[in-house]
């Protein structure tokens, strides 16, 4: 019980290893290491790994301490992964109180409102992220 707050933005699963469809920029990942969470290919395993990590965070936070997590939901082809809600559920299971949710409008940062997937399938370009706010009991 050493820290008052943890502010983090974990990898958005293995999204940095994927081809970028919105802007066609090259992919840039953190590493090729097998223990890099950004290289986990199975979504359930990724959520479980984050859950294990936040169990450790919970142990070092002081009672009443905050854990703030910046995440974004993910789409891979036709599959949608609600990372923010899956992670919120996982953190509650390891003992955090889900205190608040802030939707962070990043439109000015992304500044790219063209539809994704066109002309194949219309997809809305996500220009927001989430700040999940938890308190240690």
Locate each region found by the language model.
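Class I S-adenosyl-L-methionine-dependent methyltransferase catalytic core
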Residues: 1-137
């Amino acid at each position: 019980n050493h820290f008052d707050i943890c502010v983090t933005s974990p990898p958005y699963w293995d999204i940095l290893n994927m081809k970028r469809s919105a802007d066609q920029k090259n992919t840039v990942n953190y590493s090729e290491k097998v223990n890099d969470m950004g290289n986990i290919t199975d979504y359930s395993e990724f959520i479980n790994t984050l859950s294990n990590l936040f169990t450790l965070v919970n142990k070092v936070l002081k009672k009443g301490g905050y854990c703030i997590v910046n995440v974004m939901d993910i789409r891979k082809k036709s599959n949608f992964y609600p990372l923010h809600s899956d992670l919120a559920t996982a953190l509650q299971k390891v003992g955090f109180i889900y205190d608040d949710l802030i939707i962070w409008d990043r439109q000015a940062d992304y500044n790219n409102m063209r539809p994704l997937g066109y002309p194949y399938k219309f997809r809305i370009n996500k220009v927001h992220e989430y700040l999940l706010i938890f308190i240690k009991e």
